[in-house]
Amino acid sequence: SAASDVYKRQVSVNAKDLQAGKKLTLVKVDKKTGEKVLISSRTYKVSKDGTVTADTKDAGDYVLLNEKDAKVLSSKILKSVALKDTKKTVANGKKAKVTFDKNLNMENVKKITYTSSKKSVVTVNKNGAIVAKKAGKAVVKVKVTLKNGKTKTVKMTIKVTK
């Protein structure tokens, strides 16, 4: 392969996790913060000789986590899925935006879907932009899917005034 195709990857793993048949999850380590970031829902099985073959697209530092540590990381990330505001009042005809709490690292997010409980009162687009249509109340549901496939739904109640 050409020299331009060579990437440096450093992978860390706890030696006791390299037992044949164990499943490990590959996560990337943010060089600036040291934070572990999800890259996919895929798990890697340790082979009989104690080796693991993992595919990565990007250069960087990675860690292989055992199932327990991967669940702890996933739970921590799911807890960070929160909205800045769970209630908002918007005047009819005006716009608002769904914003996430600053603790959510968007690098862990694969997909976000937004839905309105009453499209006659409030509409919301794929980017979280809200438009107030008429006076009333509606709930905007925000479903966040992480790169490991886990999901969490959070809600924002919108009151539209005349």
Each language-model region and where it sits:
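Short, small-residue-biased leader/transition segments that mark boundaries at the very start
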Residues: 2-7
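Surface-exposed beta-strand/loop patches in extracellular or lumenal glycoproteins
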Residues: 8-19
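Exposed beta-strand face motif in extracellular beta-rich ectodomains
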Residues: 22, 60, 136-140
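Beta-strand-rich binding/interaction modules
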Residues: 23-28
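Solvent-exposed serine/threonine-rich low-complexity stretches and specific carbohydrate-binding patches
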Residues: 38-46
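C-terminal beta-strand-rich structural cap/linker in extracellular carbohydrate-active enzymes
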Residues: 51-73
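Extracytoplasmic soluble-region selector
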Residues: 68, 72-162
